[in-house]
């Protein structure tokens, strides 16, 4: 479960401070599917970056399974990202000279998973998104929707919670 308690995020540039988040309070239940909607510039991406440990909040507290992240170190965030969540970015950033399979395996390579296990899990993730027959293609041989599904497979390959 994730809890955001009075989360605030300020960006400072010189003498100017911009408040991106102003006291956000949310609670996400385990395995809950959530959509974050809002106008451009309202803080959706900032909030998701904080939840994903890609950005730090200015004040408040983010709790993961009831544990405060106020004192999290980089290694704690790395463990959380590698074992609990999967990211699908708006720009999927696939590596053009690598195959679809290699792109999905990349996250596991960074986590130190064996080659055989990487391949097995990457193929399973690609099959889940309907691309099991496309593993040897390069990103430029796929449609935009297919590339987005590769990015989804890349997010699923680490077996995020739920």
Tell me the role of every PLM-derived stretch.
Residues 2-162:
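ABC family nucleotide-binding domain
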């Amino acid at each position: 479960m994730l809890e955001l308690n009075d989360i605030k995020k300020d960006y400072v540039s010189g003498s100017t401070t911009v408040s991106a988040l102003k006291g956000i309070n949310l609670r996400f239940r385990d395995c809950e599917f959530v959509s974050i909607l809002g106008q451009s510039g309202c803080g959706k991406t900032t909030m998701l970056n904080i939840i994903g440990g890609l950005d730090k909040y200015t004040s408040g507290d983010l709790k993961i399974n009831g544990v405060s992240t106020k004192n999290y170190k980089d290694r704690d965030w790395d463990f959380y990202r590698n074992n609990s969540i999967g990211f699908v970015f708006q720009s999927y950033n696939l590596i053009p000279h690598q195959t679809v399979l290699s792109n999905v395996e990349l996250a596991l390579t960074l986590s130190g998973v064996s080659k055989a296990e990487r391949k097995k899990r990457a193929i399973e993730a690609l099959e889940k998104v309907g691309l099991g027959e496309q593993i040897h293609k390069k990103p430029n041989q796929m449609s935009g929707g297919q590339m987005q599904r590769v990015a989804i497979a890349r997010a699923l390959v680490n077996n995020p919670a739920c």
